[in-house]
Regions:
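Transmembrane helical cores of multi-pass secondary ion antiporters/exchangers
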Residues: 1-428
């Protein structure tokens, strides 16, 4: 089958699973889709063992034709980030701007260093001492909370507005920051040319600040198009230009596409839409992007479950899989509680804020896509048969599955408690 045919069949399968999950009201839809897809993968694996590998091999071969990294990083990610940013209320975002800035920028750096440091120490304890730059690579790809997974769950659970905007704002911005850090560390780890601090810093500044500036330019261009357009029915199609052609442009310019999508989405949603569109057109725009977001979310979480078929679980990697989850949680705890130690000196917060930010820091397809982008054939040790990409893929997948199935299913109780406290504080 061609990649197009595979994508069409997967889209149909995601719709069927979405219909099933809509009847199972116990879990949020994206969690149900992931769980059902994982179950389907296990059935396929078992069938391959019992009835032979022919069917299993055919399915794996077909799935491998899909470039998951390109499909997510260069395709779905731009649309999903833009859709999420359109819903962000700028007046609420401004109230939490320093918290979001610190959590997204400083928190991601702290988490990267803590996770990388812990992995370096524990790998030595296990007798497979990893290069420190490889450990930092894992820290960089797993530290950003996945905006796709986070927004899909937080929106439906109804957390208090101040906590929700922190979770949503952090997840929208820190994935772009995480990608920039990941690219910088990748150059340090794999480049054959000597790198300088100035060179790496310049890359970071160009990607991050350039992405935000480019996003503002995209928003201004779309604003002008909407303003001068006489054919009002074209406004929906015009918004598609930003995450499609706009994202390609960011890649060509060498700036962060994710940050550009977030910046342009926030500006368009808070400036262009209220000023240039009628209320009925505004509602149509919301419905249009909700449809796109829902479709891509269903397809993405289906793919996350089916990726189990493509990952090779070597016996030597089990300890790293088991240690990955607590290492990442420790990094998340430190990167949240340390900034909040300073935040609480200046402002009062819900007592569940840190807990929700820690436990709501879900990981998803973004981390897996970054892991898949690593080169193959790089051994973790001289003379070792363990491939670095395979190791980081296995560890990342363990964290992603845990965060979606365990954290995603248990965070509603924390949000319920925070809502109860919020309501109690509002009563006279």
């Amino acid at each position: 089958m061609t990649s197009y045919e595979i994508l069409c069949l997967l889209s149909a399968l995601s719709l069927v699973i979405s219909l099933i999950s809509s009847r199972l009201h116990r879990w949020q839809q994206t969690i149900t889709i992931t769980a059902l897809a994982l179950g389907l993968s296990l059935v396929i694996l078992a069938a391959g063992k019992i009835f032979g590998v022919s069917v299993y091999s055919t399915l794996v071969t077909d799935l491998e034709q899909l470039d998951f990294k390109a499909l997510l990083l260069n395709g779905m990610l731009g649309f999903l980030l833009f859709a999420g940013a359109l819903q962000i209320k700028l007046n609420v975002l401004k109230q939490q701007r320093w918290e979001i800035f610190v959590l997204a920028f400083v928190g991601t750096l702290i988490s990267t260093l803590v996770i990388g440091g812990l992995l370096y120490l524990l790998s030595g304890f296990l007798g497979l001492q990893l290069n420190f730059s490889y450990c930092l690579l894992f820290g960089a790809l797993i530290s950003p909370t996945d905006p796709i997974a986070v927004l899909a769950i937080i929106k439906q659970l109804g957390a208090p507005e101040d906590i929700a905007i922190q979770v949503e704002g952090e997840s929208l911005f820190n994935d772009g920051i995480g990608l920039v850090i990941f690219v910088a560390i990748s150059q340090v780890a794999f480049s054959t040319e000597p790198l300088t601090v100035a060179g790496v810093s310049g890359l970071f500044i160009r990607e991050a600040l350039g992405g935000l500036l480019y996003g503002g330019i995209l928003a201004a261009m779309l604003h002008g198009m909407l303003h001068f357009s006489e054919e009002r029915t074209q406004y929906l199609l015009m918004t598609l230009l930003v995450p499609s052609a706009g994202y390609v442009g960011a890649d060509m310019l060498g700036v962060s596409g994710p940050l550009a999508m977030v910046a342009s989405g926030i500006i368009i949603g808070n400036v262009s839409v209220p000023r240039l569109l009628k209320e009925s057109e505004w509602e149509h725009l919301d419905s249009f992007w909700l449809l796109i977001e829902s479709f891509f979310n269903s397809l993405l979480f289906l793919l996350l479950g089916l990726l189990l078929l493509l990952i090779h679980f070597d016996a030597e990697l089990w300890w790293f899989m088991l240690l990955a989850v607590p290492i990442v949680l420790i990094g998340r705890i430190i990167s949240i509680y340390l900034p909040y130690f300073g935040f609480r000196r200046f402002r009062r917060y819900n007592s569940y804020a840190e807990k929700i930010l820690v436990w709501g820091g879900l990981r998803g397809g973004l981390a897996l896509a970054m892991a898949m982008s690593l080169p193959t054939g790089v051994s973790i040790l001289a003379g070792s048969n363990i491939d670095l990409r395979e190791l980081l893929m296995v560890m990342t997948y363990a964290v992603v599955v845990f965060s979606i199935l365990v954290q995603g299913t248990t965070i509603p109780s924390l949000i319920d408690k925070s809502n109860a406290e919020h309501e109690a504080q509002r009563k006279p």
